[in-house]
C-alpha cells in the first residue's frame, strides 16, 4: 500500500527529547458496525473517571512542559489529550460525533495520548512536524465561519506543502484535512513523550487498528514508529 511518511524536524529534540509517535496509514473499507467507536468512547470515559492509566498525569505534565518550551500556555491551549480528559472529568461523558472520530478520541482518553486523525487525500505532500516561521496559513472556523490564521513564529506545527494542518503541536486541527468515516484513506498519529511507556503506545495503536477492523472489515493498515 502507498503510505504517507511523516517527518520530524531534528530541532524538536531540543524541547522534546525522547519524543516518539506511532504513524498509522489506513486504506478504509465500508463501515459495517458504526457502534464500535461510540462503545469504545463510553468505556474510555469511564476509565478516565476511574483514574486510568496510572501514569496519565505524568504524561500530561510532560506535554505541558513541552508546550511551555515553545511559548504556548497549556492552561489556555492544552495538548489534545488533556483537553479531552478535562471535558470528561467535568461532564462525565463525551457525545458521539462520527464513528472513526469517536474511536480515536477513545484511544486518546484511554491512554492519555494525543491522537490526530486526518484525511490523507486532502494532503499536499507529506506531513511535517516543524517550528513555524509565522508565514504559514491555517484554515479554521471562528463563530462557525471559515477564517485563515497564521501560527506564531517558533510555534510547533504539523504542516504540508499547502499550510498548517495542526497548530500548537496537537492542540487544534485544521478544517481542510479533517477526517470522517466516509474518507477512503486515513492517517493517524499517536504522539508520546518518555513518560508514556512505549509498550502502552503500541497498545494504543492496537486499540485503534483493532477497532477500525471491527468497524470496517477488509481495511488495510500500516504502522510505523517515528521519533527524534
Map each language-model feature to its residues:
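Charge-biased, low-complexity intrinsically disordered regions
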Residues: 1-228
Amino acid at each position: 500500500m502507498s503510505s504517507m511518511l511523516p517527518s520530524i524536524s531534528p530541532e524538536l529534540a531540543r524541547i522534546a527529547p525522547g519524543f516518539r509517535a506511532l504513524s498509522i496509514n489506513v486504506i478504509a473499507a465500508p463501515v459495517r458496525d458504526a457502534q464500535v467507536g461510540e462503545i469504545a468512547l463510553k468505556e474510555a470515559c469511564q476509565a478516565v473517571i476511574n483514574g486510568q492509566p496510572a501514569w496519565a498525569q505524568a504524561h500530561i505534565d510532560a506535554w505541558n512542559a513541552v508546550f511551555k518550551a515553545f511559548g504556548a500556555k497549556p492552561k489556555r491551549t492544552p495538548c489534545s489529550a488533556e483537553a479531552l480528559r478535562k471535558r470528561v472529568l467535568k461532564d462525565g461523558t463525551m457525545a458521539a460525533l462520527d464513528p472513526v472520530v469517536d474511536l480515536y478520541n477513545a484511544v486518546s482518553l484511554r491512554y492519555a495520548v494525543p491522537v490526530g486523525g486526518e484525511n490523507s487525500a486532502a494532503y499536499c505532500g507529506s506531513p511535517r512536524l516543524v517550528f513555524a516561521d509565522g508565514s504559514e496559513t491555517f484554515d479554521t472556523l471562528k463563530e462557525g465561519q471559515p477564517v485563515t490564521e497564521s501560527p506564531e513564529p517558533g510555534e510547533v506545527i504539523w504542516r504540508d506543502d499547502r499550510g498548517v494542518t495542526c497548530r500548537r503541536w496537537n492542540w487544534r486541527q485544521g478544517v481542510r484535512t479533517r477526517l470522517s468515516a466516509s474518507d477512503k484513506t486515513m492517517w493517524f498519529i499517536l504522539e508520546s513523550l518518555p513518560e508514556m511507556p512505549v509498550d502502552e503506545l503500541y497498545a494504543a495503536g492496537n486499540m485503534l487498528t483493532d477497532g477500525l477492523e471491527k468497524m470496517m472489515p477488509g481495511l488495510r493498515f500500516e504502522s510505523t514508529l517515528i521519533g527524534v
